[in-house]
Every structure is written in C-alpha cells, then in structure tokens.
Amino acid sequence: MNLHEYQAKQLFARYGLPAPTGYACTTPREAEEAASKIGAGPWVVKCQVHAGGRGKAGGVKVVSNKEDIRAFAENWLGKKLVTYQTDAQGQPVHQILVEAATDIDKELYLGAVVDRGTRRVVFMASTEGGVEIEKVAEETPELIHKAAIDPLVGPQPYQGRELAFKLGLSGKQVAQFTKIFMGLATLFLERDLALVEINPLVITKQGDLVCLDGKLGADGNALFRQPELREMRDPSQEDSREAHAAQWELNYVALDGNIGCMVNGAGLAMGTMDIVKLHGGSPANFLDVGGGATKERVTEAFKIILSDDKVKAVFVNIFGGIVRCDLIADGIIGAVAEVGVNVPVVVRLEGNNAELGAKKLADSGLNIIAATSLTGAAQQVVAAVEGK
C-alpha cells in the first residue's frame, strides 16, 4: 500500500526528519491560505498522486504569487494526472501539496527496501539524486552505496556515518545525515514498510540536508497491526478491479491487452501471459486465483476480468495439484452461467481430475472451448479474438 507524499512527510516529521513546511489542500482557497500560513514565497505546488514523473507531466510547479497557486489548484483538482508511471487514464488529483520552496545546492538519494536475497532491510544512498534509482543502478551501479540492517541489533549510527562519508558529506552534514538515516530506519521498522525513498534528499544553499520528496510503501501483509497506516489508504488511487480482487484474496494486476487470463499460481500465470504474447495476443491482466480456488472465487474472478471493457476473450489455465480440476470446472460452469459471459472462453485443465473436469465442461452445453495443451490453448484464444 502506497502513501501520498504529504502523508510520508507527516511521518517524517514525527521521526525527526527535516522536510519543508507544507499543507495538503483540497480546494483552491485552501491552497491560497496555506501559502499565507507558510509565509513569503516562492512556494512549490504538487499534485498528490501515487505515481512518479509528476514534474515532467506538469504536476509540480514553483510559483511566486498566490494567484498562480489558485490557478494551479483550479487546473488540477478533480482532474487526472498522466505520467510515465500511470496508465493512459492517469490518477485522480484530490489534494495539492503547497510547501515552501527550497534553495537547492545539490541533490542526493536515500532509500530502503527489503532485500529478499539477504533477508535484510538494505539502505541505498547515492550522489545521483533527482533521477530514477533504477536508471542509476543500470548505468552507474558504482554510484550506489549500501548498508544492510542486522535484524538482531538494528540500525547503527556508524552505518549512517559511513554512507555520509561515501556521499562526500562533511562537518555538520554528517551528523544531519546520520540523524536522517536513524530516523528513517526506525520509521521503516516500526511501521512495517516495504519501501521508502527520499528522492531528492537535498543539500540547501545554507549547507543543510532537507527531505524534499518522500515515498513510502507499506507491507500489505502487516497492515493488520498498523491501524494508522490503514486509515491513510486512498482507494481512489487504486484500480477498482484490483481492490475488488483483494477482497476475495485474488492476485490481480490490470494490463493493456484484450485477452483476460485466469490462472492458479503466479508462475503459471506469468508463463500463460508469455505464451499468449508469443502467439500474437495481448494479455488484459494477471490474475492468480491461488491454490484455494472455489466456485465463488472463480465466479468473482470472471466478474473482475469481464468488468474490463477491453476483454475480447478469456483464457482459463488451471494445473490441478492442490485444487481438483473437476471442482474448477464446476466453478467455471457456474460462473459462465451466472455472469452471462458473451466472449469466447478457452479452458485448459491439466493434472488432478483433469479428464473429469474436461468432461463436465463438454457436457455443460455452454460456449466453452476446451484445449488439451498450453500451446493449443494460446493459439485458440488468440484466434478467437481475431475472429478466426
């Protein structure tokens, strides 16, 4: 679960991290009043969406008068911001962050993730702030410095100092960076985060460090013990189909294609999308119904897939290991009958009770295309979309 920048900075303040004074506003009038509270300009106004690339899309602007703040708010509030990280529809803008502008001398990067390889929280710091860290990692990996947090002893000040020295900081900046490092690490661990980024972490003209931007991602599996973070959730930033799927413990990710995919198992789901693409098709989604697929969950999965107007065919690919294929067949038959599917449905069953499942599908009398192989199923669903 992602948080907005203004929410991240509210948490930063509680953990002693320096950030510009700012206010999240929902109306143009509030935005003007926020500027008055902050004091003399210039100010920075930022659209609050769960996506990067806001600046290039016009969602971040430095302004020197309150009329420009009002104009920015009137232009964006209630609209959608499209960036390279959103889909073509963009993300809705419901808040504008107004904050004091900062005189920047240099931009740095500081972030942390859970490294599954080392099973540690790993901090990353770089002198290449203000750009995507993925790009830095690909082109100049030597510019990324890391510090792994030992889960038994927790973050240590010496780790912050080591990173500060590697970034070329000196004097009071080392102490400031160490304080930011310790505060951010404590925030990460206490709040069950999966990702945190300060990009950029800037050195001001006065030589001080300031967290100019903030991105936090919470571990969804730990939200049950983070009630405050749960209250910060913004459903408007989430795909409605993905939210519906989460209620049924279905793993769903919307894509841009026209072939709906329903599969059990994440690996098989990715392989299914690959083979659809290989044969000239385009997946409309990733959907993993998991090992506990029931008739009810299969029905909901069909509803979610078909709620996407782009879907022209559905590919069901089930390997029966834990789950029995005949029970999946019952679920498919019930779902097709209940939902009223009016697009071709190609089903490939393999494994536990696959023959019985295939017989049930054949005897159902419904417009379901049975496939006996993965390659054949992919070819059939692509042909169905093309009307062949």
From Swiss-Prot:
As recorded in Swiss-Prot or TrEMBL, the protein's gene is named sucC
Instruction: Provide the cofactor note recorded for this chain's UniProt entry.
Output: Binds 1 Mg(2+) ion per subunit.
Q: Supply the source organism for this entry.
A: Pectobacterium carotovorum subsp. carotovorum (strain PC1)
Listed under catalytic activity are: succinate + ATP + CoA = succinyl-CoA + ADP + phosphate; GTP + succinate + CoA = succinyl-CoA + GDP + phosphate
Q: Which residues bind substrate?
A: N264, G321, I322, V323
Q: Do you know which PROSITE patterns this protein is assigned to?
A: ATP_GRASP, SUCCINYL_COA_LIG_3
Say which enzyme class the record assigns. ligase
Q: Which PANTHER family match?
A: SUCCINATE--COA LIGASE [GDP-FORMING] SUBUNIT BETA, MITOCHONDRIAL, SUCCINYL-COA SYNTHETASE BETA CHAIN
Question: Which parts pass through the membrane?
Answer: none
On subunit structure and binding partners, the annotation says: Heterotetramer of two alpha and two beta subunits.
Q: What is this protein called?
A: Succinate--CoA ligase [ADP-forming] subunit beta
Q: Which residues bind ATP?
A: K46, G53, R54, G55, E99, T102, E107
